[in-house]
């Protein structure tokens, strides 16, 4: 960590104007509908912490996705300055949080290098959050300030003492701005992984309280380590990663790391000033041209082209190549605001010159590595030639087929790809039902016999010789491979994988996804691939049958059924509560149960279910020992009354001296093993806790002496609302036969249309790639040649399996 220089309110330069942010958020943060703007909110805050790391003052960052879809970002940097800003008359922290383009990066002495995508600052995050809490640890004190929709609720105030320093920002994006507030683990992990590789030595912990998942990202070795990570579970062709880093006199910094592996796909990542370029740009063009030139020059010098009687191309050179190009440019030019493509012309020359120099030297100084790489390149050229011949054979056979389409394909009448659907169906029997049940105008059916080839393990020439793969390629019409592929010739823009809900169905679906991910990734990127979602249950009641789509719908159906002819009597003499009134109470109670289930990764339901019946604890009351002691006694009483065999609960108070509060802690002893659960201040301040106690208070106050539920002639005396609902659910379950549905072949054509193929009622999952690096690794681990990584994956994830079908 570097020594502290003067970093106070005088370092904060102000460029005013925040009014437009809420009116046109897309200009500042990206699309507010598709999730990109939502995730960029997190990246803006994380980038501030990375800037502290680049300045040498921070090496530990924590990002938490909370159960209510709020986000916390905490670092151990210097802490945002809290002294009064001379120009603005409020704390410097408040200036940073409320004024657009205010911050230390506009003062060259505070940050020499800074990241960030749009360069708008954390003030935009504040403006677009329904609530944001800023906590700063600095100069031995803890400072805190709360904002609602970007407006400070009170001045910055001291709330405790601390021996550490750093900044903690906890924000909840505004539902008024963002269409869908759901954070994707994959999108956040992808960016955080990149940042940890690009900033060696910085540790970033990503935690997801919704699922209990967490991952710590910290890598020494920069881009070299990044390439090694990308090639995990793959066999390298050149044993050592080629790497160079140079700072040129023209101000452009160039760093490249690369290594070939035994796969058949190229994986090139480009960055400018830590920002990824999805569409490449001038740095990629310079890299590709110099790579091909250097390798072809080496082949010519060694006389390998004549010896092997083959002509190599740039595509052959990049088969199985993993490479990262990172440039540092003082004033980069991009094709758009999202910076997906670099257009600075001077960067092409810089990358080309440095790559020519260093890579040519590498080939000459490492003859064994060079021969292995060139050997792979020549093999790729041979395979390309073999694939061309195989394609010609396929075309000759196809010429005999009048339509040029596979015989098994039942095509649709529609010729507009945007309106056409292709169902890839498992097996001929389900294919027959689908053909009879479909809408012939827009829906085409292609039955796939058996399991298609695993393309992860097969060379290109072998793959296109496979009958099932060949049939699929012909049906799609867009071709495959660099020479043949043309997305404009794709015959269907809706390709739907429809397989059974068993192990074989899952395997076939995985093989098809592997094929699309490896060979036709643009179809996935454009959102053309879908997975059909047939119903999960068939429910019989008497002679009536009904298909139900999933567990949530099943719970809804059974609840509705349980409430038929049911009534709740609040005491012995009270009139019955039934119909819409009872349904409303049940829905409120179910919403509480869902909240508790969501929280169960952090706090066991066996504890939190009692909070429904306990008085509310406010944040102020946490500081009152007597109040907390009385509340704790009630909790302990309930825990004792519900104690199960082999379990023991012991509740106590733990003092948090930093915040001057008393926190409930429960010791759970299960068969002699003790674990501890502490309910922290954030829990009692959360919306989830308030929802639980508010609805709990409402339901508890309803029931009096002699309360009971009744259904028909049967009745059950109850003390708590949950008792009554459980009894009604058990009663209705007895009257239903529930079958978990697995095979498409179990449905007749009409049922298949009504449940799975009718566009007005069907459910489908769109296949997307949010983290291409993680997707590459998972496909390689599960579908590749190496057995050991696959076994490790299965062993480490075995306990997470919720539905194992033998």
UniProtKB/Swiss-Prot annotation:
SMART domains: HATPase_c (SM00387), TOP2c (SM00433). Belongs to the type II topoisomerase GyrB family. Few gyrases are as efficient as E.coli at forming negative supercoils. Not all organisms have 2 type II topoisomerases; in organisms with a single type II topoisomerase this enzyme also has to decatenate newly replicated chromosomes. Its main location: cytoplasm. GO terms for cellular component: chromosome; cytoplasm. InterPro entries: DNA_gyrase_B_C, GyrB, GyrB_hook, GyrB_insert, HATPase_C_sf, Ribosomal_Su5_D2-typ_SF, Ribsml_uS5_D2-typ_fold_subgr, Topo_IIA. Mg(2+) 2 binds at residues 500, 502. Residues 420-535 form the Toprim domain. Binds two Mg(2+) per subunit. The magnesium ions form salt bridges with both the protein and the DNA. Can also accept other divalent metal cations, such as Mn(2+) or Ca(2+). Mg(2+) 1 binds at residues 426, 500. It is found in: Cytoplasm. One of its GO terms (molecular function) is DNA topoisomerase type II (double strand cut, ATP-hydrolyzing) activity. One of its GO terms (biological process) is response to antibiotic. It catalyses: ATP-dependent breakage, passage and rejoining of double-stranded DNA. The record marks 451, 454 as: Interaction with DNA. Its cofactor is Mg(2+); Mn(2+); Ca(2+). Heterotetramer, composed of two GyrA and two GyrB chains. In the heterotetramer, GyrA contains the active site tyrosine that forms a transient covalent intermediate with DNA, while GyrB binds cofactors and catalyzes ATP hydrolysis. A type II topoisomerase that negatively supercoils closed circular double-stranded (ds) DNA in an ATP-dependent manner to modulate DNA topology and maintain chromosomes in an underwound state. Negative supercoiling favors strand separation, and DNA replication, transcription, recombination and repair, all of which involve strand separation. Also able to catalyze the interconversion of other topological isomers of dsDNA rings, including catenanes and knotted rings. Type II topoisomerases break and join 2 DNA strands simultaneously in an ATP-dependent manner. PROSITE patterns: TOPOISOMERASE_II, TOPRIM. Its EC number is 5.6.2.2. The keyword Metal-binding applies. Keywords: Antibiotic resistance, ATP-binding, Cytoplasm, DNA-binding, Isomerase, Magnesium, Metal-binding, Nucleotide-binding, Topoisomerase. This is DNA gyrase subunit B.
